């Protein structure tokens, strides 16, 4: 089995989602051969030199334990944790994936992405994305002291939350034409992505070919979800918090 998750947005402000993820890693996830995290594991990541923060250390240890137990964990960057780097990968035993990434199994082919690169109708967001994905901008940010980066991240979160107020769903969907081009470019593979917080299965017809697009669910304080590939079909599996022993 292969599991796919995204948009957990873990932070000290989300203890329920954090505990759910830790339970998932210690339990259900280990029944899979591989776990793919398609962006925004963290609400914010300000650099791998913040790896020893007690909150981060607990999650890193859980990822490392799951990796050591034989679970192959792969991660793509999201729009919140784009600074996750090689030190984080080494500490956890995971591998960082390019975006997009083509996953070929014995039975099927998938193309994986966080998904935000196709939200072309949101000009403000695309300008933000182009800025924060720029290597020179990232290097300049990482050169700042850790405390200053924390303050910048807090300010960015505040601005983001203010811009989302009053919106039923602040996330713009993928642009239809760009999505069809993407599916064509990647050989009509089944497309799995996150980012939009609008879980659904979409059926595209591209050049007369039926292509499925699966949108992963975002996680909440009391529930999450993973998409499961069992070698024959994709199914959604609800995840809920277990009572403490």
Predicted features, each with a name:
Residues 1-3:
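Extreme N-terminal starter segment of soluble prokaryotic enzymes
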Residues 5-6, 35-39, 72-79, 97, ...:
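Active-site neighborhood of phospho(di)ester-bond hydrolases with catalytic His/Asp-centered motifs
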